[in-house]
């Protein structure tokens, strides 16, 4: 069994390069290429802001290769990635193919693309089916992931796409392709 963790939390403080190195030094076998910085989403305004992050620029694949090499130099590999979010934003959806490309370039085998929390399995399947031919060409599987919504009035989590085992299976069955897999995020499951 291999253990991995995402680099997003550390990269906010020290950048992706050091984050990969620190994940290795912490004893993990692999790293999750967290690509949330590819798009700077303002949650209060509900809009994408301009960013100068390397993943948003024209040399994004060179940046992915650089991170891969840092991992290899430190004895770990990229096993998976997280595409930018939220999926409900059409402008962010336009970056999903870039995220799949970066996953392949970094050596990852799975790119996690969150379902749209408020869409049905059939509606989310349309998005995944549109991306699957490109993902297959890159040799990367797409993973859907268990999600949650928050009810401010009740101060508790409430239903979202893939929040239950039934919804998770419904999403996988709606696509019915071995290149769409499931990622159970235990941080989302609490």
Q: Model-flagged regions — what are they?
A:
Residues 1-109, 136, 173, 177-181:
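N-terminal pre-domain/capping segments
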Residues 2, 18, 31, 130-190:
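Acidic/histidine-rich catalytic cores of soluble enzymes
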Residues 9-11, 35-37, 84-87, 116-119, ...:
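Active-site-proximal loop/turn and secondary-structure-junction residues that shape catalytic pockets
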Residues 41-42, 119-128:
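Active-site-adjacent beta->alpha loops and helix N-cap segments on the catalytic face
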Residues 44, 91, 123-124, 154-155:
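Short, well-ordered secondary-structure micro-motifs
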Residues 59-63, 93-98, 124-129, 161-166:
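Charged helix-capping and loop-helix junction motifs
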Residues 91, 119, 159:
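Short, surface-exposed alpha-helical recognition segments that flank or form part
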Residues 103-122, 138, 143-154:
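Active-site groove signature of glycoside hydrolases
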């Amino acid at each position: 069994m291999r253990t991995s963790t995402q680099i997003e939390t550390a990269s906010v403080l020290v950048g992706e390069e050091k984050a990969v190195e620190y994940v290795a030094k912490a004893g993990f076998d692999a790293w999750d290429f967290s690509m949330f910085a590819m798009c700077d989403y303002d949650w209060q305004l509900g809009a994408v802001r301009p960013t100068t992050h390397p993943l948003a620029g024209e040399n994004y694949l060179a940046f992915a290769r650089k991170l891969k090499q840092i991992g290899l130099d430190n004895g770990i590999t990229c096993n998976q990635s997280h595409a930018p979010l939220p999926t409900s934003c059409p402008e962010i959806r336009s970056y999903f193919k870039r995220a799949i490309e970066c996953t392949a370039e970094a050596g990852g085998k799975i790119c996690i693309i969150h379902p749209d929390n408020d869409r049905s399995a059939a509606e989310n399947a349309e998005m995944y089916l549109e991306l699957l031919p490109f993902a297959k060409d890159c040799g990367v599987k797409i993973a859907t992931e268990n999600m949650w919504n928050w009810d401010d009035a009740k101060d508790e989590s409430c239903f979202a796409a893939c929040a239950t085992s039934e919804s998770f299976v419904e999403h996988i069955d709606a696509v019915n392709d071995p290149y769409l897999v499931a990622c159970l995020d235990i941080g989302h499951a609490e």
